[in-house]
Amino acid sequence: MKYTKEHEWLKMDGLIATVGITSHAAEQLGDLVFVELPTENKVVSLGDEIVVIESVKAASDIQSPADGTIVEINNNIVEDPNLVNSDPLGEGWFFKMEIKDPSILDEMMDENEYLSFIS
């Protein structure tokens, strides 16, 4: 897995990245009550605000971690936003995207670097 400074994780399968937020981010946000996901086949750029989440504490936007195309969204978290809190690294994923340039992954953190970043 790779991690961003915005507390997103990416799990790669070829050029397809499954993207979600880390346990740390989910804990900071508190219980989620609403998730709005991008549409499938949407072309996105690094830094685009593509997911809207609302929790009991705050509203927040999730940015695209790379240039690419959204290929799948997790409708389960739209119906049950609590999945993000209960299983942020598994069933609580947000979307899958085809990454245009995989070299962007070299700029992201591995697990040990991320754990140091949040401590």
Residue ranges, per PLM feature:
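Short, solvent-exposed beta-edge and connector elements
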Residues: Q28-F34, V56, S64-D67
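Short, Lys/Arg- and Gly-enriched loop/turn segments at beta-strand edges
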Residues: E54-Q63, D80-N82
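Structural motif
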Residues: I16, D67-T69
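Residue-level recognition of beta-strand microenvironments
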Residues: L10-M12, V56, I73-N76, P102
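Acidic, low-complexity mobile loops and tails
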Residues: M1-E49, N82, S86-S119
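A short, compositionally biased micro-patch
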Residues: T4, M12, S55-V56, P65
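Short, charge-rich, low-complexity interaction segments located
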Residues: I70-S86
